[in-house]
From Swiss-Prot:
NCBIfam families found in the cross-reference section: hemL (TIGR00713), PRK00062.1 (NF000818)
Top-level lineage group: Archaea
One function term, GO molecular function aspect: glutamate-1-semialdehyde 2,1-aminomutase activity
GO cellular component, one term: cytoplasm
The species this protein was found in: Methanococcus vannielii (strain ATCC 35089 / DSM 1224 / JCM 13029 / OCM 148 / SB)
Subcellular location field: Cytoplasm
Keywords assigned by UniProt, alphabetized: Cytoplasm, Isomerase, Porphyrin biosynthesis, Pyridoxal phosphate
Record-stated family: Belongs to the class-III pyridoxal-phosphate-dependent aminotransferase family. HemL subfamily.
Pathway the protein contributes to: Porphyrin-containing compound metabolism; protoporphyrin-IX biosynthesis; 5-aminolevulinate from L-glutamyl-tRNA(Glu): step 2/2
Designated name of the protein: Glutamate-1-semialdehyde 2,1-aminomutase
Modified residues (N6-(pyridoxal phosphate)lysine): 268
Amino acid sequence: MDLNIKLDKSGELFNESKKYLVGGVNSPVRSFKPFPFFVKSAKSCFLYDEDGNEFIDYCLAYGPMVLGHANEKILNAVKEQMDFGTAYGVPSEKEIILAKEVINRIPCAEMVRFVNSGTEATMGAIRLARGVTKRNKIIKFEGAFHGAHDYVLVKSGSGALTHGAPNSPGIPEDTTKNTLLIPFNDEGAVRKVISENKGEIACIILEPMMGNVGCILPKDGYLKFLREITEENGIILIFDEVITGFRLSKGGAQEYYGVKADIATLGKILGGGFPIGAIAGKKELMEQFSPKGQVYQAGTFNGNPISVTAGIETLKNLNNAFYKETAKKAEILSNYLIETTEKYKIPARVYSVASIFQVYFNDKDILTYDDAKSSDTEKFMKYFYSLLENGVFIPPSQFECCFTSIKHDDFVLEKTMNAIDIAMKKL
């Protein structure tokens, strides 16, 4: 594949990388043909690669960088913390400070357990739900991605779907037999599976908007329905807010949609660009974690002072004006995508919520995993490569979503729209 862009150094690094790293990358979502560009630095809403190319970034490390890359306030706070140590193995006051910030924002949060990733957060939340209810089965929605662990890596989204492995080898059937799969946005399917497994379901886990299969929004009233039916059946409702937490609003999807879960899992934005995850929920549930209760969860780097410091500084800067501005930027780009696909008569559906957006090359509405899978992925990749050639980087998959940050200014948006027009004209 010939791209009209200089990537000589990235090509050399990729060839070397393949000798030492599986597939040349450390996460499948970073892999695309002929090879990914290698980043040398990042600042504001830009990535700079080893060949000197500048890219406007709408991937934002798959979501965390809402304040832009190399944000000075975060860097200064982290540099100051580094003088006091980088890992302790005992508690620090900053863990309390960040926990309070989470509790003040996330509606269901009465207590918090910090972990190191979104994967750890969902794994711990599911274990907690099973431990509390003494039930084994969980409900998961087709296409939802809740991390790379055995409980949920079944009909999964994100890189698992992009690279053709939504059901990973290496996961025993005995593990996945307790994972009940149903389509998103289908009330009848929820009622049916609960009825067929009465008293056996520990939890329903879901992304309130499915951000790992593009951008699939919940139907009006759907989240409220899930809240009601879980309460009626003693099922714990887990919102996986690794993407939506602190992005849709101060209180994440729960505040945005007006539905309160029992447990929320968090990550990405919470760490301000550093590794972190969190499980946040009702006190009577959270206190079942050890050492207070019997459900075991632990980690050497849980509550790491560097990540916690970055998280505190990040949340300080997420006010109402921030949410209004970042949502407006996504709305501008979404409207332009609609305008250009219509202008060039390209079958497409565009979805956005707050500062998240995505275009599907499809002539039908996208409400489920199967709808998303029916999209024209070849056309999407042509769109991706054209944007890349014109200095715009989006996630290289139909099954991810794009993000805006506070740093995407009017000039950047104008350049982006010009690149979109060129891409759509080619299609």
